[in-house]
C-alpha cells in the first residue's frame, strides 16, 4: 500500500503539529483532524487542498521582485510546511530551481548570518569535538538516509563562507527531494564549523559561527574522522555526500573515505558524472565518440581533474589505452598548461600533466603555455571551464577553436553566473550557432541567425538525486566509479539532442524526476553487478525505486492517545 494512502498515527496534538515542518498541513487539516488534534481555532475555517495552498503560495512568490527575497520566502515555507514547499517547487521546477539553488543560493550563503531565521540541519563546531555523538542524537531527523556535509571553505566560486555554507547542503537536499523523490524526513544537512579565514566574517558582529581561524592539518583530519565514525554509529546505512570542501581537503577526504563508507564528493564525482554524460550526448549529436575528442580544461583543481579522470576512464571503456586517452587531455591553470616538469604539482594533477617532450615542438613553446597556445597547437574539439574566473573564454580563443573544429563543444561550467568563463550568447555568436554549449548555471535561450538554441544546464542536479535514489533503492554499501559511469551513460541516453537531433543537450528540468528514476535504475544495476548490493530482478528493482520515490502529498493523521 502507498505510504501516502496509509494514515500516520501521532501521539501529540495542538501547536506541536503546526510547528513541525514535516507534519504541518496548515489549512489542509480535515475537520476530523482539527477536532481530534485540538486544532480548532488555531487555523482559519476554510479547508483547502494542497494545490489550492500552492496556488496562493505561488501568487505570493510572484510578488517578490528580487531572487534573494524569493529564496528567503521559499525557505520560510520549507521551514513551516515541507510538503507544501515540495509541491510548490515540483509544480514550478524550472522557475524555482535557480532560486532554491544556483545561482541564488550563493548570495544566500553570503548573507546567511544576516538573514538567519530558523534552525535547519546540524552545526557541529570544533569546540564540541568531544560531543559529536550527542549532537547527532539531537537531530530532529531520526531515520536519516542521506547526509550532505560541508565545511564552508569553498562555496561555489565565492570562497570561504564559514557556516554560511550551510545554504549549500540545505539546497542540495531540497533537490534530492524535489528531483530524486527522497523523503525530506530522511535528509540531513550538516556544517562542520571549523572556523573561517574570511576576515569579513571574523569581523562581522552578526556572524554566527565559531569566530576563529580555520583549523587544519591533523586537527582537521581527526575532527572529520570523529564525525564520520559518529555518523556510522548513528546511521550506519546513510549515504554521505561531501560538498564544497576546499581543494586541499576535497580529494584527500574522497580517497580516504570512498572505500570505507557509502560516500562521494559531488564537486568532484558528481560534476564529473554530469559532464561526462553531457559530453557523451554532445558526441552523439556530432556523430563522433568521446575517445575521438581532444579536450582542454581551464581549471586544474580537484573538480577539473576529477572530470578529466572520469573522461579518461570513459575513453578507455570505448577501447583506447589509458596512455592514449591522457595524451588527448590538456589541463590549463593559472600557471599555464600542466607539464610533467613543473614543481609543486598536486598528486591528482601529476597524472594529467603533459610530457614536456611532446610539447616542445609547439609554436610559442615556453614555461607558461597559455590557453590560446593550447587551442592553437592541440586543436581541441572540447573546451571545459572550471576556473571560477569570468570572461576567460575570449572571442579570440573560441574563434581559434572553431577554425579547426566545425562543431566545437564548449562547456563554461563555473558557478555562479557571475563567474562563467563566457556566456552562451557570445559563444554561439562567435561560432555562428555551430557550438554545442552547456553551462553550470541557468541561461535563457539564445537566438542566432533566427534560430533558437536551448542552453543545457550541466548541473549536478541531473545526477546526484538519481545516484541517491539508486543507492537507497538497492541498499548499496558504496558509491563506485562504475556506478558513476552508469549514471553518465544513463543521462546521455536521456538527451533530446542525442536521441532526436534537435533540442537541448540535456533533458528539460520538467522531466528531471523521470530522468532521476532512469539514472537510479542504472546506478542500482551497476551496484548489484559489482556485488555492492544484494541481487535483485529488474522488476523488483523498479518496484523498489517507485516505492522509495516520495511524492509531496498530505497523509491522513490518526491520534494514538488522548
Swiss-Prot record:
InterPro entries according to UniProt: Aminoacid_DH-like_N_sf (IPR046346), Malic_enzyme_CS (IPR015884), Malic_N_dom (IPR012301), Malic_N_dom_sf (IPR037062), Malic_NAD-bd (IPR012302), Malic_OxRdtase (IPR001891), NAD(P)-bd_dom_sf (IPR036291), NAD_malic_enz_proteobac (IPR023667)
GO terms of molecular function: malate dehydrogenase (decarboxylating) (NAD+) activity; metal ion binding; NAD binding; oxaloacetate decarboxylase activity
Binding residues for NAD(+): 154, 267, 415
A Pfam short name: malic
Annotated active site: 101, 172
Transmembrane regions: none
GO-annotated biological processes: malate metabolic process
Positions of a divalent metal cation binding: 243-244, 267
Catalyses which reaction(s): (S)-malate + NAD(+) = pyruvate + CO2 + NADH; oxaloacetate + H(+) = pyruvate + CO2
PROSITE patterns listed in its UniProt record: MALIC_ENZYMES
Cofactor dependency: Mg(2+); Mn(2+)
Keyword Transmembrane helix part of the UniProt annotation: no
Subunit structure, interactors included: Homotetramer.
Family: Belongs to the malic enzymes family.
PANTHER family associated with the record: MALIC ENZYME-RELATED, NAD-DEPENDENT MALIC ENZYME, MITOCHONDRIAL
Entry-linked HAMAP family: NAD_malic_enz
Protein name: NAD-dependent malic enzyme
Organism listed in the record: Shewanella frigidimarina (strain NCIMB 400)
Gene that this sequence comes from: maeA
